[in-house]
Regions:
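Hydrophobic/aromatic residues positioned on beta-strands within the core alpha/beta folds
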Residues: 77-79
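Acidic catalytic/metal-coordinating carboxylates
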Residues: 33-36, 59-62
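Short hydrophobic/Thr-rich beta-strand motif most characteristic of the beta2 strand and flanking loop
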Residues: 25-32, 40
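Receiver (REC) domain active-site loop signature in two-component systems and cognate sites
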Residues: 55
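Conserved sequence signature across two-component system core domains
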Residues: 7-8, 31, 49
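Alpha4 helix (beta4-alpha4-beta5 surface) of REC/receiver domains from two-component response regulators
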Residues: 62, 82-100, 105-109
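Active-site residues of response regulator receiver
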Residues: 52
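Charged docking surfaces used in two-component/phosphorelay signaling
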Residues: 15-23
């Protein structure tokens, strides 16, 4: 079973994404900030990380940088409510950029693209 980490400071988003991904057959872990995300990356052989950009304690951009230092092969999808970040996406080392939405089809499509069986 493929393992996904959902890191977001908004509990409702974490739960929404986690439940949807579990229904799709993935094992899902959750983190409320970048520091928690790094701890999980260190302990669990993940297949994908979905990372919010704005989080307390350590933001998603810094967490992304550290994740890619440790696991350059691990796909990381940046997720945000702020569409204006799209112009900055190319300068970050993430694999994908996703604007949060209640329509989870984009999320599922991105996950399937990176976790093809």
């Amino acid at each position: 079973m493929k393992k996904i980490l959902v890191a977001d400071d908004e509990t409702s988003i974490r739960l929404l994404y986690s439940e949807e991904l579990k229904e799709e057959g993935y094992e899902v872990y959750q983190a409320a900030n970048g520091l928690e995300a790094l701890e999980i990356v260190d302990k669990i052989p993940l297949d994908l990380v979905i990372l919010d950009i704005k989080m307390p304690e350590m933001n998603g951009i810094e967490a992304l940088r550290q994740i890619k230092e440790k696991r350059p092969d691990l796909p990381v999808v940046l997720s945000t409510s702020y569409g204006e970040y799209k112009q900055d996406f190319a300068t970050w080392a993430s694999d994908e950029y996703l604007v949060k939405s209640s329509d989870l089809e984009d999320l599922k499509a991105v996950v399937k693209r990176y976790l093809k069986e």
